[in-house]
């Protein structure tokens, strides 16, 4: 399972890292904010023209309201903007499956958690 997933990922193309200064003249179809900036209500120093047309933006942070990164993505017309709540639930479901052999339905859990976050927010 993991080896097949890794091979499929490698077939998509090369993966490389860089600093914020190296992003100025590049466009991306997918931008994942895995920095700690959202924990502090801050926005990473992103170039204005970072997103390709229809790009997806994903913030690992989740909460009752959109993060600064998510608001930035919406202002820059990202095709899709998501937070990390789905990843949290899906990782828990995958762990439950590995431990118990049962794959829980995640959509109702995500919906319930989203409602609870909105109540508290």
Give residue ranges: language-model regions:
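Short glycine-/small-residue-rich Rossmann-like dinucleotide-binding loops
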Residues: 35-37, 61-62
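Glycine/threonine-rich flexible loop motifs
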Residues: 39-47
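A short helix-to-beta-strand connector/capping loop
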Residues: 10-16, 77-79
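NAD(P)-binding Rossmann-fold cofactor-contacting core
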Residues: 1-12
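Short, well-ordered alpha-helix to beta-strand connector turns
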Residues: 28, 54-55
């Amino acid at each position: 399972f993991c080896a097949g997933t890794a091979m499929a990922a490698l077939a998509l193309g090369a993966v490389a890292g860089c600093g914020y200064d190296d992003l100025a003249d590049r466009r991306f179809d997918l931008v994942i904010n895995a920095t700690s900036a959202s924990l502090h209500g801050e926005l990473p120093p992103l170039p204005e023209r970072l997103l390709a047309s229809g790009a997806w933006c994903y913030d690992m942070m989740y909460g009752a309201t959109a993060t600064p990164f998510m608001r930035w993505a919406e202002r820059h017309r990202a095709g899709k903007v998501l937070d990390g709540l789905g990843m949290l639930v899906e990782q828990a479901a995958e762990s439950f499956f590995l431990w118990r052999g049962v794959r829980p339905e995640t959509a109702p859990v995500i919906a319930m958690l989203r409602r609870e976050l909105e109540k508290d927010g």
